[in-house]
């Protein structure tokens, strides 16, 4: 492809609202343009990469035994009401009405419609298992779209679903998709890790995320030498053992803390550290208030609390609910005496709260805190559990060794859904005894557009993108210099271009009438694996200049040996 005939608008500077490396480079390199908040156009160069990812994923899905379908983006309210998600999916679900007033949504996922497809046609265990997949644009009305195409409102993904009669069957197919995703990540040239994950809005009872490792990743991964790995939303922490208290238990005492509503403010006022505090948080779980207690320097993991409560929805309580539950103000509520005021309320405490001796808590009145608070003596939680987000120093819940922490970008997610959707939607089959059962289901999503961004986050330098060879939109960036003053340059360039393309290599020929510096900058920005330069200086010596994108220096090679170079290119694809 000649650049003079190709639509490739590059930019010297990234737009100011581009907030990640991948967003900046995708915009500058002409892969995408922004239409609206969280919505992007994919230009020819970006689309070539997207289609390469799509083909890799398609090949692995086919190899796993799944079959491709095409499902509607616009889905009727009635299907989502059957699953219950019309109500609890929340504002991220974009809802619309047609001219007759019928309600629909722009699908962020496809569990409902695929379950409807299968329940209409699959009635017997003899027809199982079934595995179907699709590539489709999805829409999720993110409250704050960010990170370019990684957290966009409109995105492109592959989602697959499997239906089974037995637990053995779903386990077998879950492993098939798990291995297929590992192959996808390997073929894309990624350094990656598969980690245990929370099931989130999809639901189910078991899931893994496939993380592309990158320092700029939005997800933190807790990783142990024993082989256990999970994102910090899911990571199980070893239950701490607390030695007998060395300090003498002191009598609780109220202290004035005027206008000090944060742990930081009170700690400074009292000359204490955050780990001495008992933090009280109020939530509503499926509409019912609950109280969580954390050590002051720890962050509550809402996913763990939600799972513990087996709640569909968990939200932070508003000020009115907070006051009703605690009888106090935000920043001043504490566990001491709370059960006496509100006997029906349940206290859920993280394990680490049990280790606090002579701690500090809210005094349940304005501008007052209580010091010398000790759990079990001054209050008793209903439940102790692992409720914290894993952080530096925490021990692995499987073996007790210290976690290592890395960052990653989620590109794929696999779920064992069980009967979450089939039961609520009455999707059933008959077994060999003519007894009816809900399908056991699996769900397997992979973000095609996210993979493109993740590749850039993992592989780039100060000059631009460094594409892994399997994802590169072209194999070679061929640069011609001095064609206007030296006919020999054009002759040799055309010859090499023809030889490369006839060998099945994809070549982008920069034949623009631009300065060499501009061409070289664009070559680095676009990030193709190989660069060849033909100029007056090289043809004089019967040579061409060759540079790998990952190398700092270019080397000279003989034009007569181009056939050997072609073999190297073919081997590296």
UniProtKB/Swiss-Prot annotation:
It comes from Elusimicrobium minutum (strain Pei191). Keywords: Aminoacyl-tRNA synthetase, ATP-binding, Cytoplasm, Ligase, Nucleotide-binding, Protein biosynthesis. It catalyses: tRNA(Pro) + L-proline + ATP = L-prolyl-tRNA(Pro) + AMP + diphosphate. Its EC number is 6.1.1.15. Signal peptide: none annotated. CDD domains: ProRS-INS, ProRS_anticodon_short, ProRS_core_prok. GO terms for biological process: prolyl-tRNA aminoacylation. One of its GO terms (molecular function) is aminoacyl-tRNA deacylase activity. The keyword NAD does not apply. Belongs to the class-II aminoacyl-tRNA synthetase family. ProS type 1 subfamily. Homodimer. It is an enzyme of class 6 (ligase). NCBIfam families: PRK09194.1 (NF006625), proS_fam_II (TIGR00409). Catalyzes the attachment of proline to tRNA(Pro) in a two-step reaction: proline is first activated by ATP to form Pro-AMP and then transferred to the acceptor end of tRNA(Pro). As ProRS can inadvertently accommodate and process non-cognate amino acids such as alanine and cysteine, to avoid such errors it has two additional distinct editing activities against alanine. One activity is designated as 'pretransfer' editing and involves the tRNA(Pro)-independent hydrolysis of activated Ala-AMP. The gene is proS. This is Proline--tRNA ligase. It is found in: Cytoplasm. One of its GO terms (cellular component) is cytosol.
